[in-house]
Regions:
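N-terminal low-complexity, Ser/Thr- and acidic-residue-enriched intrinsically disordered segments
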Residues: 1-72
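Structural motif
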Residues: 4-6, 125-128
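Conserved nucleotide-sugar donor-binding subdomain of glycosyltransferases
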Residues: 72-126
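Short His-centered aromatic/hydrophobic patch
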Residues: 131-133
Length: 135
């Protein structure tokens, strides 16, 4: 692989050594080959930035965070991602809850994140978009 591996997930690994599962596997891979992990900042802000922020260097790879407003968190994360997509992706249509602004909030966050990733991605980078938060 000529370029960097860029992992995009809803959350960043919060520990220096994540415990088990896919997060651990990706963390160890990035520690060996380098790259970037992009995920949401753990705290909301009234004015989300149009740029990614460095969240801490993990040795050979960098963690970058994107910010969410309380409204983004409500509509993108709690709303469309967790109340619509999660139930649909897990064959639990009976749990789907629709709300005003869910789809619009989801689309806005994904569009903003796409613009942010374009600022750091290089043509030869491999981008791994993980999970339904970023369909």
């Amino acid at each position: 692989m000529a370029g960097r591996l860029i992992v995009i997930s809803n959350r960043l690994p919060s520990e220096a050594a994540p415990s088990g599962g896919l997060v651990y596997a990706l963390h160890e891979t990035l520690r060996k080959i380098g790259g970037i992990w992009i995920g949401s900042h753990p705290e909301t802000t009234e004015t989300p930035s149009e740029s990614l922020s460095e969240y801490g260097d993990q040795g050979k790879y960098t963690r970058l965070s994107f910010s969410l407003s309380p409204e983004d968190y409500k509509n993108f994360y709690l709303g469309f991602s967790n109340s619509v997509l999660w139930p649909v992706c897990h064959r639990r249509g009976d749990l789907v809850e629709l709300g005003r602004g869910f789809e619009r909030g989801y689309s806005a966050v994904n569009a903003r994140l796409a613009r942010q990733v374009m600022k750091v991605a290089r043509p030869d980078d491999m981008i791994w978009v993980h999970d339904y938060h970023f369909f």
